[in-house]
């Protein structure tokens, strides 16, 4: 308790330098953020058993690789470097991965020559082994049955076939059939009535706490299915490493879908899984939606109680997983349970939540479309994959895309005839033509230099204009001064009083003119002073 759970994904992130070195040796490049996105969000949706926390299982990695390398529109070329790097780490594991890589079981070896764990010392009481009995070809003496310390009569897989699904094991005298069983390795699941009933607990020699190593149903060597329940560590990790159903129903639904696909749980396992990962109210809602999804013979949802109870019972059914009929019932039950999870995860209609989904600055159009479709599934009753809703999804995709992409999409010719796929391809072209950070820095630097040059040119032009304006104002001022002096002189002469026809202009007396004025001095007339003019140099 209190310790961080190590998963394949967290392990690679802790040794990211080694991951980058492996990718470099393969001549590819990987990014940490996309590494996390593909591992936890993309590859689990391929329905090949990939867990959200990653895995080093080469079979699952190969299935994901096939999906990634699929030709045509179903392929994912952008994920090729990541799955190739992950495969290289699993095939040729570095030292920090080797403890978490489990060797494949020797299925090709004959049953008489497998590698067996060493026998315990004689001084130590041997524990019950749940592995199939393997005898040496040279030793014809039957191997004695070894029982646990407790005296309870338990079913031993060494000598008997596992019981059918409905048939419980014989009751233990003390009421607990697992009281004397000791886990073969550390991290074994806690004892439970289911374990004591079916005697199916099995732990691998080296267990990874984040990846289940025991599927509930496995085909045994005798042709019958053997039952191994979920380990408590798996249930604990699933519950603590994922959000609640109310918080993020899509993520938890994807986890349960992966578990249903890879583990093939029984009816009891499904109830245990729902009881661990869901609250009581959430579980009831899921069961109700699953029962609504039951279809009749006509392929339509039915309301007949008998058909609903036969397909999705609320009480433990009598389904024997060793028969084809029982396995078919379990497969149908899991499908209905998954439909109930998907329907119960839909929130009340809230178009504001859908409109709030906008494309990030560095988000690809494909990733944005997936988030938009998920919002439609979560906050509306509409299916975004429905052809009737394609127009609404397309309009939301255009209006809520990045501003540069949205503007160009709106200007497309014959926009009404474009399908959603056409819009995504056009958006991808626009997104890929965006300038790189280096180009953006170069453009900003160039624009800054051009702006600075324009500013300097404007300053010079402004200074020249200021000088010309000052020169014109000074010229106007000087001209005004000169014209004012002239007007003063001319205006002074015009202000002389008007004389009568017989009045002297010199003495202002009547009866004579100025040339005959006796008061006017007689003598030579002096030169008239000239008015001085100011120039711009003065």
Curated annotation (Swiss-Prot):
One of its GO terms (molecular function) is structural constituent of virion. GO terms for biological process: viral budding via host ESCRT complex. Residues 434-466, 486-519 have a biased composition (Basic and acidic residues). Residues 430-435 are annotated as: Interaction with host UBE2I. A zinc finger (CCHC-type) spans 502-519. The record marks 131-132, 215-216, 478-479 as: Cleavage. It comes from the Viruses. Pfam families: Gag_MA, Gag_p12, Gag_p30, zf-CCHC. SMART domains: ZnF_C2HC. Residues 345-393 are annotated as: Interaction with host PIAS4. A motif (LYPX(n)L motif) lies at residues 130-134. The modification Phosphoserine is found at residue 192. Residues 110-218, 434-538 are annotated as: Disordered. Residues 110-124, 161-173 have a biased composition (Pro residues). GO terms for cellular component: host cell plasma membrane; host multivesicular body; membrane; viral nucleocapsid. A motif (PTAP/PSAP motif) lies at residues 111-114. RNA-binding phosphoprotein p12 is phosphorylated on serine residues. Keywords: Capsid protein, Coiled coil, Host cell membrane, Host cytoplasm, Host endosome, Host membrane, Host-virus interaction, Lipoprotein, Membrane, Metal-binding, Myristate, Phosphoprotein, RNA-binding, Ubl conjugation, Viral budding, Viral budding via the host ESCRT complexes, Viral matrix protein, Viral nucleoprotein, Viral release from host cell, Virion, Zinc, Zinc-finger. A motif (PPXY motif) lies at residues 162-165. Residues 438-478 form a coiled coil. This is Gag polyprotein. It comes from Friend murine leukemia virus (isolate FB29) (FrMLV). The gene is gag.
């Amino acid at each position: 308790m209190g310790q961080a759970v190590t998963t394949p994904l967290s392990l690679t992130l802790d040794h990211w330098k080694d991951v980058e070195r492996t990718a470099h040796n393969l001549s590819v490049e990987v990014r940490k953020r996309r590494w996390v996105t593909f591992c936890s969000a993309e590859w689990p949706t391929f329905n090949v058993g990939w867990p959200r926390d990653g895995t080093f299982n080469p079979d699952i990695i190969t299935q994901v690789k096939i999906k990634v390398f699929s030709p045509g529109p179903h392929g994912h070329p952008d994920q090729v470097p990541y799955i190739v790097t992950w495969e290289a780490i699993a095939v040729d594991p570095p030292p920090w991965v080797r403890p978490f890589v489990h060797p494949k079981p020797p299925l090709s070896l004959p049953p008489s020559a497998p590698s067996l764990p060493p026998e315990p010392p004689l001084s130590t009481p041997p524990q019950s082994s749940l592995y199939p009995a393997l005898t040496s070809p040279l030793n014809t003496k039957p191997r004695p049955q070894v029982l646990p310390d407790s005296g309870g009569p338990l079913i031993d897989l060494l000598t008997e076939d596992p019981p059918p699904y409905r048939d419980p094991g014989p009751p233990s005298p003390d009421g607990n059939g697992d009281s004397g069983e000791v886990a073969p390795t550390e991290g074994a699941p806690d004892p439970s009535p289911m374990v004591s009933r079916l005697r199916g607990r099995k732990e691998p020699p080296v267990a990874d706490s984040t990846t289940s190593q025991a599927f509930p149903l496995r085909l045994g060597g005798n042709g019958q299915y053997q039952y191994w329940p979920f380990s408590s560590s798996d249930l604990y990790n699933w519950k603590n490493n994922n959000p609640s159903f109310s918080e993020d129903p899509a993520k938890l639904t994807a986890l349960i879908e992966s578990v249903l696909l890879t583990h093939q749980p029984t009816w009891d396992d499904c109830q245990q899984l729902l009881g661990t990962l869901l609250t009581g109210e959430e579980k009831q809602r899921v069961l109700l939606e699953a029962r609504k999804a039951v279809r009749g013979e006509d392929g339509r949802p039915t309301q007949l109680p008998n058909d609903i109870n036969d397909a999705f019972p609320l009480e433990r059914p009598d389904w024997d997983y060793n028969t084809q009929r029982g396995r078919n019932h379990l497969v149908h039950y899991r499908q209905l349970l998954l439909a109930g999870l998907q329907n119960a995860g839909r929130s009340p209609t809230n178009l504001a939540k859908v409109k709030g989904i906008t494309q990030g600055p560095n988000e690809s159009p494909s990733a944005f479309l997936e988030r938009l479709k998920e919002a439609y599934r979560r906050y509306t009753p509409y299916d975004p994959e429905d052809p009737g809703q394609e127009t609404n999804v397309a309009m939301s995709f255009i209006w809520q895309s990045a501003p540069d992409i949205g503007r160009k999409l709106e200007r497309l010719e014959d926009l009404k005839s474009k399908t959603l796929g056409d819009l995504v391809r056009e958006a991808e072209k626009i997104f890929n033509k965006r300038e790189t950070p280096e180009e953006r820095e170069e453009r900003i630097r160039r624009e800054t230099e051009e702006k600075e040059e324009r500013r300097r040119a404007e300053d010079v032009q402004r200074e020249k204009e200021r000088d010309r304006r000052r020169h014109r104002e000074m010229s106007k001022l000087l001209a005004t001064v000169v014209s004012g002096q002239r007007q003063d002189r001319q205006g002074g002469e015009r202000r002389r009083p008007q004389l009568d026809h017989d009045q002297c202009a010199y003495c202002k007396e009547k009866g004579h003119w100025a040339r005959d004025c006796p008061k006017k001095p007689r003598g030579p007339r002096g030169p008239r002073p000239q008015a001085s003019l100011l120039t711009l140099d003065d």
